Amino acid sequence: MPRSRITGNLIDKTFSIVANILLRIIPTTSGEKEAFTYYRDGMSAQSEGNYAEALQNYYEAMRLEIDPYDRSYILYNIGLIHTSNGEHTKALEYYFRALERNPFLPQAFNNMAVICHYRGEQAIRQGDSEIAEAWFDQAAEYWKQAIALTPGNYIEAQNWLKITRRFE
């Protein structure tokens, strides 16, 4: 049974009802509807921590979806799953791919910055300050891009940039 037909909490039920109504009234092709159904099912599985199921749905949505903007969100969510699984190299790849299709995803820039910052901290623990600085510099660049897109957000990142004198 498709996940979208599974009953859940009130928010999930409401989202499913609204999504189904929109799919009926907005002129879309059957392929677009099917892609959205897989995307919605992927989001549902992801929110429950069922990452393998979510990835299957997202890959199927990617196969069907042709709109670059919509594909960017599918790729972003795949990146989130890889981040959650500690697969940072894969996550960065998917965030990059999402940004290629939609350069206005501050959350992708933020997540890339967080991964780079984490790798910088790992390098410090391993005693490699030169590599750490390179990772921190890269994190700073990504955070600057996220902040440029949404100036009121990412306050902690803004503070880190100021404290480390990386904010221009």
Swiss-Prot record:
It comes from Populus trichocarpa. Essential for the assembly of the photosystem I (PSI) complex. May act as a chaperone-like factor to guide the assembly of the PSI subunits. Belongs to the Ycf3 family. TPR repeats lie at residues 35-68, 72-105, 120-153. Transmembrane segments: none annotated. PANTHER family: CELLULOSE SYNTHASE OPERON PROTEIN C, TPR REPEAT-CONTAINING PROTEIN MJ0263. This is Photosystem I assembly protein Ycf3. GO terms for biological process: photosystem I assembly. It is found in: Plastid, Chloroplast thylakoid membrane. Its main location: plastid. Keywords: Chloroplast, Membrane, Photosynthesis, Plastid, Repeat, Thylakoid, TPR repeat. SMART domains: TPR. Gene3D superfamilies: Tetratricopeptide repeat domain. InterPro entries: PSI_Ycf3_assembly (IPR022818), TPR-like_helical_dom_sf (IPR011990), TPR_rpt (IPR019734), Ycf3/AcsC/BcsC/TPR_MFPF (IPR051685). It is a peripheral membrane protein. One of its GO terms (cellular component) is chloroplast thylakoid membrane.
